[in-house]
Curated annotation (Swiss-Prot):
It is an enzyme of class 2 (transferase). GO terms for molecular function: alanine-glyoxylate transaminase activity; amino acid binding; identical protein binding; L-serine-pyruvate transaminase activity; protein homodimerization activity; pyridoxal phosphate binding; transaminase activity. Homodimer. The modification N6-(pyridoxal phosphate)lysine is found at K231. It comes from Rattus norvegicus (Rat). Gene3D superfamilies: Aspartate Aminotransferase, domain 1, Type I PLP-dependent aspartate aminotransferase-like (Major domain). Keywords: Acetylation, Aminotransferase, Mitochondrion, Peroxisome, Pyridoxal phosphate, Transferase, Transit peptide. Belongs to the class-V pyridoxal-phosphate-dependent aminotransferase family. This is Alanine--glyoxylate aminotransferase. The keyword Mitochondrion applies. SUPFAM superfamilies: PLP-dependent transferases. The keyword S-adenosyl-L-methionine does not apply.
Length: 414
């Protein structure tokens, strides 16, 4: 016995010596980066673009709280509180409600990867970039994608969608509630009931609308709803919220094939988030600090009340629109009834380069606004009054910045 231990010790010792010799035969060719020799410094800015938005002080403070393990009982309590907060802002009682460890794009993929199988018929409302993205993801899955293409700035009627449902017989319809690339608010009443008459599920993207616009997941018959953390909720970007009702859950759990993504497989995520009422099963390491922040952001909107949040966004944006009209700016969305109350799009004034305007507002006022995205690129300026930032004071500040930018930025007279 002792001889065997001694022999093992000699063997391990020779291996350790070999490792040391090998380490000595190599050199560090990459020096420590000079840029990392000093602490990080971030400029103070007012974020009035389409997102992310400024963090509320309480949310910002949550980011400096102590780390705990993601599979500890204290963390499970936080996760349960987050689930309750999501159920409140979604207005749903779905047990299968959780956070995806990834941005709104990841929530979109979570929905599509779990709901669609190769060969499934998928109907997409494409009136901005998010419909385009949903269609591309579904094509990669192998679904049969049918796009209802609209001009940027337009929305869908029940009649138009019914025609698509009757023609293509999809298993899933995708609509964007708040199309942040164009500034359109898509009405949702009646679409869930319509889809169900055609044995189709309704998937809604509410990344740019949640918290700023009324949405009622259960009452409006929405089968799958997702949103992001970084807009009205004023939490750090990088996590997203999602909920599946029983019809959607049944579709997921009766698949013939496994979802193409292990990371976003809802059958695993539901176990991690305790959605099945059983012992939680580890799937991946959760972004603990981001979840602290999301918990606090959901607490803030719960304390404020959804109806108060909706009203505040409506009033702040109405004031912004008044200021923009006084500047002579034209709204990209012509119909006032379908203008998104969280993100406003105005047409780039004739003769101006939108980049000059955005740069001037940032350089002289420390305010971030944005140009267009996807089909609205080079066509619009996007201004967001999101959550904590949705105030008439901020509307006045960005309007004054735009007024000065239009006076000083170069204008092409041709």
């Amino acid at each position: 016995m002792f001889r065997m231990l001694a022999k093992a010790s000699v063997t391990l010792g020779s291996r350790a010596a070999s490792w040391v010799r090998n380490m000595g035969s190599h050199q560090l060719l990459v020096p420590p980066p000079e840029a990392l020799s000093k602490p990080l410094s971030i400029p103070k800015r007012l974020l009035l673009g389409p997102g992310p938005s400024n963090l509320a002080p309480r949310v910002l403070a949550a980011g400096s709280l102590r780390m705990i393990g993601h599979m500890q009982k204290e963390m499970f309590q936080i996760m349960d509180e987050i689930k309750q907060g999501i159920q409140y802002v979604f207005q749903t009682r779905n047990p299968l409600t959780l956070v995806v460890s990834g941005s709104g794009h990841c929530a979109m993929e979570t929905a599509l990867f779990n709901l669609l199988e190769p060969g499934d018929s998928f109907l997409v409302g494409t009136n901005g970039i998010w419909g385009i993205r949903a269609a591309e993801i579904a094509e990669r899955i192998g679904a049969r994608v049918h796009q209802m293409i609209k001009k940027p700035g337009e929305h869908y009627t029940l009649q138009e969608v019914e025609e698509g449902l009757a023609q293509h017989k999809p298993v899933l319809l995708f609509l964007t509630h708040g199309e942040s690339s164009t500034g359109v608010l898509q009405p949702l009443d009646g679409f869930g009931e319509l889809c169900h008459r055609y044995q189709c599920l309704l998937l809604v993207d509410s990344v740019a609308s949640l918290g700023g616009v009324p949405i009622y997941m259960d009452q409006q018959g929405i089968d799958i709803l997702y949103s992001g953390s970084q807009k009205v909720l004023n939490a750090p970007p990088g996590i997203s919220l999602i909920s599946f009702n029983d019809k959607a859950k049944s579709k997921v759990y009766s698949r013939k094939t496994k979802p193409v993504s292990f990371y976003t497989d809802i059958t695993y995520l539901s176990k991690l988030w305790g959605c099945e009422g059983k012992t939680r099963v580890i799937h991946h390491t959760l972004p603990v600090i981001s979840l602290y922040c999301l918990r606090e952001s959901l607490a803030l909107i719960s304390e404020q009340g959804l109806e108060n949040s909706w009203r505040r966004h409506r009033e702040a944006t109405a004031h912004l629109h008044k200021c923009l009209r006084e500047l002579g700016l034209k709204f990209f969305v012509k119909d006032p009834e379908i203008r998104l109350p969280t993100i406003t799009t105005v047409t780039v004034p004739a003769g101006y380069n939108w980049r000059d305007i955005v740069s001037y507002v940032l350089d002289h006022f420390n305010i971030e606004i944005s140009g267009g995205l996807g089909p609205s690129e080079d066509k619009v300026l996007r201004i967001g009054l999101l959550g904590y930032n949705a105030t008439t004071e901020n509307a006045d500040r960005v309007a004054e910045a735009l007024r000065e930018a239009l006076q000083h930025c170069p204008k092409n007279k041709l």
